[in-house]
Amino acid sequence: SRCTHLENRDFVTGTQGTTRVTLVLELGGCVTITAEGKPSMDVWLDAIYQESPAKTREYCLHAKLSETKVAARCPTMGPAVLTEERQIGTVCKRDQSDRGWGNHCGLFGKGSIVACVKAACEAKKKATGYVYDANKIVYTVKVEPHTGDYVAANETHKGRKTATFTVSSEKTILTLGEYGDVSLLCRVASGVDLAQTIILELDKTAEHLPTAWQVHRDWFNDLALPWKHDGNPHWNNAERLVEFGAPHAVKMDVYNLGDQTGVLLKALAGVPVAHIEGNKYHLKSGHVTCEVGLEKLKMKGLTYTMCDKSKFAWKRTPTDSGHDTVVMEVTFSGSKPCRIPVRAVAHGSPDVNVAMLITPNPTIENDGGGFIEMQLPPGDNIIYVGELSHQWFQTGSSIGRVFQTTRKGIERLTVIGEHAWDFGSAGGFFSSIGKAVHTVLGGAFNSIFGGVGFLPKLLMGVALAWLGLNTRNPTMSMSFLLAGGLVLAMTLGVGA
């Protein structure tokens, strides 16, 4: 699956009868959804971008100077005049020069002198700013069912589907083929202040340099370089790249300050690099909060017969996925399609299946299958696939796993923020409380009771509540009632 190849992976486990779960998706992360009686899915935020954002300013990094002209007057003859002074696109400077008999003036003294030069910009030497429009930013969410096929990190799963969202998007329904339909309703949020963010892009050259950066608007507007708006042929403040020498009689030299690309690149050291793909300008941070509807999903292969246990062979022996799960792949030489008999037992309990399958109902298909992912309790275990067996030691501890999943649940609830609560009605408020409990404690509950059936969990919750009602000690009574209520809520709830 896609999530097994990413470092930032989260698990959301639906309870019995779950029809809807709430996910927090961020760039670079991936969430695996598991629910009893439903196929597992990987969901991730693939990209945040805007196509062809509006230009704000263009800066010139290297001036192109031409048509230099100088005019001078003798002392007492008035100011020197050039018609170019009144022309747009020229840079001029007035000064005083020493005049006398040696340079054709009858009087000694200071005479007026003016120099003008036409200023343009060298080709491929512009830095352009682009601004984002929050209403036009597209958030791409991808969904991939766990089909039992191994897919390498650089390959694309044939069942992968894509949904796009903006601030005004409605619910999207994706068809996952034989696995049914899944609905997505996502609220989007960028991770940057779009009003104060500019994408600074250099003209593309053959140099192997970053071409775009994500900068602050005030910093961008304060750049001491010639600038113009898109479509305007003339540069404002072109004198910033022009230097005039000291005047000598009727002569004033004009100097080009040269290419400022290196100076700009030095100033951009440490600034986040922006990713541009064609006309898509990507944001580096942001998240979406999605309500995922599972009610129309269906399990594939429930009508298959069980595979012949003696005809399996390891293709990839069990391996740690890096996400507190175990992944493996088998081949099968018998009649296809069929269901893979897979289980795991802990040391000292040979009759209790302790495997929590991330790949539900693993199957061998005519054209693939055989990839299995499972979660095992910490300690010594034996994995069985048909007649194959493999000794496995799962690192960690049950308490540590509970704390880790609870911490992630609190992080999810924090990111969802105000959207997690509905104060419009009493029913909505209590529903919000249920969702919050599932978001924070769902992973921990699954870690503790993952191998316990629905009926035992229900009876346990009822028993704890009954003890709470019949205990005379107030502290013990409240403790039993709270524990029983949580077990019942997590067992019977349909929101996660």
Swiss-Prot record:
Molecular function in Gene Ontology: protein dimerization activity
Extracellular side: 1-447
Cellular component terms per the entry's GO annotation: host cell endoplasmic reticulum membrane; membrane; viral envelope; virion membrane
Positions of region (Fusion peptide): 98-111
Glycosylation positions in this chain: N154
Highest taxon, organism lineage: Viruses
GO biological process, one term: symbiont-mediated suppression of host innate immune response
Transmembrane segments: 448-468, 480-496
Pfam families associated with the record: Flavi_E_stem, Flavi_glycop_C, Flavi_glycoprot
UniProt entry keywords in alphabetical sequence: Clathrin-mediated endocytosis of virus by host, Cleavage on pair of basic residues, Disulfide bond, Fusion of virus membrane with host endosomal membrane, Fusion of virus membrane with host membrane, Glycoprotein, Host endoplasmic reticulum, Host membrane, Host-virus interaction, Inhibition of host innate immune response by virus, Membrane, Suppressor of RNA silencing, Transmembrane, Transmembrane helix, Viral attachment to host cell, Viral envelope protein, Viral immunoevasion, Viral penetration into host cytoplasm, Virion, Virus endocytosis by host, Virus entry into host cell, Zinc
Residue ranges that the UniProt entry lists as topological domain Cytoplasmic: 469-479
UniProt signal peptide: none
Disulphide bridges, residue numbers: C3-C30, C60-C116, C60-C121, C74-C105, C92-C116, C92-C121, C186-C290, C307-C338
Protein name per Swiss-Prot or TrEMBL: Genome polyprotein
UniProt source species: Louping ill virus (strain K) (Li)
